[in-house]
Amino acid sequence: MSRKIKMIWDFRGPASAKTAEHHEIHLKEYIALEKLPLNITGFEVFGEMQAIAYMVVTDENMIQVRDALKPHRAELYEE
């Protein structure tokens, strides 16, 4: 079984929550367009000035997604 990797985009500022929420829409569109095997996305708000959007990919798709979408960072995903 391959590892799952959580790709993360950071947003800061007063509009960070809305920006992260909107970015998740585009991540879902990318997953559908590229027919990726996992459909795990989300966004989290860490106060008024910081939020993230994320998507989870497999090891096999990590390079493709990283090069196309340029996430700010990544970490291993644990359910």
Label each residue range with its predicted role.
Residues 2-79:
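Long, contiguous binding/interaction regions
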